[in-house]
């Protein structure tokens, strides 16, 4: 709970600045890249979140990271602030909250679409179009593959789930036959 409120506070502050400067989308993308980079490197995560490392050591790494990702000054300053306050461990939650605020601001929703096999571009676009009609918003797909579905897709938009998987259809048929 505390982590969520702290992350929300930082994300809202940065988001307000992004709106003011008209940089919501670029900052959202660069923050997501930053998050993926940090999460993808256990060593980097260790250095950034472990208070054993001095402030100067963390700051030097953050400077190199910001330069490598070509972060604009405000997102980079967020990193420095988090480092100075030993809160770099909150980065993932801050980025997720910022991304949610950005999506809401830009009138879009994210849908998690799970399929039995990888979706090609046209199938993914068709699903996104149908979900856009249902939600009256632009839909961005986060795709996953789960062979256990056997066929079809499961789409989740917020708390709403559309389950068109073969696995669920077979389970429904099995239940009906048992009655």
UniProtKB/Swiss-Prot annotation:
A GO term for molecular function: proton-transporting ATP synthase activity, rotational mechanism
Membrane topology qualifier: Peripheral membrane protein
Keywords per UniProt: ATP synthesis, Cell inner membrane, Cell membrane, CF(1), Hydrogen ion transport, Ion transport, Membrane, Transport
SUPFAM superfamilies on file: N-terminal domain of the delta subunit of the F1F0-ATP synthase
Subcellular localization(s) per the UniProt record: Cell inner membrane
Gene Ontology cellular-component annotations: plasma membrane; proton-transporting ATP synthase complex
Disulphide bridges, residue numbers: none
Keyword Magnesium: no
Family: Belongs to the ATPase delta chain family.
Role: F(1)F(0) ATP synthase produces ATP from ADP in the presence of a proton or sodium gradient. F-type ATPases consist of two structural domains, F(1) containing the extramembraneous catalytic core and F(0) containing the membrane proton channel, linked together by a central stalk and a peripheral stalk. During catalysis, ATP synthesis in the catalytic domain of F(1) is coupled via a rotary mechanism of the central stalk subunits to proton translocation.
Subunit note: F-type ATPases have 2 components, F(1) - the catalytic core - and F(0) - the membrane proton channel. F(1) has five subunits: alpha(3), beta(3), gamma(1), delta(1), epsilon(1). F(0) has three main subunits: a(1), b(2) and c(10-14). The alpha and beta chains form an alternating ring which encloses part of the gamma chain. F(1) is attached to F(0) by a central stalk formed by the gamma and epsilon chains, while a peripheral stalk is formed by the delta and b chains.
Alphabetical list of PANTHER family matching this protein: ATP SYNTHASE DELTA CHAIN
Record's protein name: ATP synthase subunit delta
Gene: atpH
